[in-house]
C-alpha cells in the first residue's frame, strides 16, 4: 500500500479472533524500518491475528508496518466476534497486509498486486470489504 491508500484492515471471514500477537520492530529507536514490500521488512513492527470460523477453519492476517509511520493500531482484542468485512485495525501510511488461508481449502482470486492476469491487471486496487481475494474449493 502506498501512503495515499486507505489503511483500514477488515476481517477476511466471519468468526472469532482467537489470537493476536504484536511484535515491535527491531533496530535503534524503533528502526531502521524498511518498505513493507521488501523481504527485509520481516524486522518491521507487525501484528499477527488469527480468525476462526465456527467450523474450525483458521485464517491468519499479518499487518506489517512500513518505513514511514511504523504504527499498527488494532481496534479489536482476542475473543472478539467479527463479521466478514468488519474493520479490525489500521496501519498508518506505507504498509503491507498478508492473508494466509489453508491451501487445500481455498484458491486465490488475486495473487499479488504485482502479479497481473486478465481479470485483475497489475496495480489493481482492492475495494474495501467487497473485493474477493480467495474462493473456497
Q: What residue spans do the PLM features occupy?
A:
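Contiguous, well-folded functional domains in the mature portion of proteins
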Residues: 1-137
Amino acid at each position: 500500500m502506498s501512503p495515499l491508500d486507505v489503511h483500514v484492515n477488515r476481517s477476511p471471514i466471519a468468526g472469532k479472533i482467537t489470537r493476536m500477537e504484536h511484535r515491535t520492530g527491531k533496530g535503534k529507536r524503533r528502526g531502521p524500518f524498511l518498505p513493507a514490500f521488501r523481504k527485509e521488512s520481516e524486522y518491521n513492527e507487525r501484528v499477527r491475528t488469527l480468525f476462526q470460523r465456527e467450523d474450525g477453519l483458521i485464517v491468519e492476517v499479518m499487518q506489517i508496518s512500513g518505513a514511514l509511520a511504523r504504527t499498527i493500531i488494532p481496534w479489536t482484542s482476542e475473543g472478539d466476534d467479527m463479521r466478514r468485512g468488519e474493520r479490525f485495525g489500521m496501519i498508518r501510511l506505507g504498509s503491507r497486509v498478508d492473508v494466509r488461508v489453508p491451501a487445500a481449502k481455498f484458491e486465490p482470486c488475486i495473487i499479488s498486486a504485482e502479479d497481473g492476469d486478465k481479470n485483475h491487471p497489475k496495480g489493481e486496487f482492492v475495494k474495501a470489504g467487497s473485493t474477493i481475494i480467495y474462493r473456497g474449493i
